[in-house]
Amino acid sequence: MYHSRMPTASSLHVVLVHPEIHWNTGNAGRTCLAAGATLHLIEPLGFSLGAREVQRAGLDYWEQVDLRVWQHWEAFEEVLPSLGAPWFFSTKGRQAYWDAPMGSASGAVLVFGRETAGLPPQLHERYAERFVTMPMHSAHIRSLNLSTTVGIAVYEVLRQRRALAL
């Protein structure tokens, strides 16, 4: 890790692996701030973090986002066990996200792939049992928008925690 804005005790982490679209990252950051989550970005990114569009998508909240930037997945993976249980979101997941026990008090790490290709194959192999999906009614839809999926997943964790009274 080489970039961090502020320390956090967050037990909810959102990880975007190689995000390509600045608007999605800005929106995900805004959701993280609203939910008290840390946003982790795994390089390479498809944009500059200094881009006006990223900041506009996050509105005037962007500077308050607890942001961590990692040069590659392996660097992030070293700290992953200390953050909580990872859940990988993919159209290839076998379990619906609402059936996954993501609300653990020990921490939840929600991992999302890039907009055009999803998560790298090596993550599918290594973490196959941790993959979840967002069921979709229409076969005409390949996937949901990344920032929409982040919002659904983050608030599902919060809903589960409330149900568990954590």
Residue ranges and their predicted role:
Residues 1-166:
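Post-transcriptional modification and biogenesis factors for structured RNAs
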